[in-house]
Amino acid sequence: MSAKRIVSLVPSITELLVDLGLETAIVGVTKFCVHPKHLRKNTTIIGGTKNLRLEVIRQLQPDLILANKEENVREQVEALAAEFKVYTSDIGNFDEALSMIKTVGELTDRLPEAEALITQINQAKSRFEAVKPNNSKHYRTLYLIWQKPWMSVGGDTYISNMM
């Protein structure tokens, strides 16, 4: 059964839903889901990734909520999972990101679109690897992902693994 009312608790997943052609099914997003810009005009803002407005989400009566282990607060996601269908992604590397895309495609009856996107991503990765020098140096890098407060990538994270 295709999801008709989706709440996305993660900006990157919101963008994925749009890429899969599900823009009209999205009924709720976080205040950090800023792409595509026009999406916020037609959806309900359900708080931030760490401070969800659970009552607003309940009023939306979603048939699917998409969350992420690192982005969202476990207790809030568990409270929603007691009432609604919730998928929580846990992405630490490239292959897990592709697996999440496929899973979201399956959950939303958009598997062909998800598989096409995975193919595009793999092709882009192959093109990048073809031009990357074999003796590429590894540089220490400070990648700031947020300010107020300042936060950077570190440790065993998806972004760190991709870099």
Q: What are these regions, as identified by a protein language model?
A:
Residues 1-163:
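N-terminal ligand-binding lobe of clamshell/alpha-beta domains
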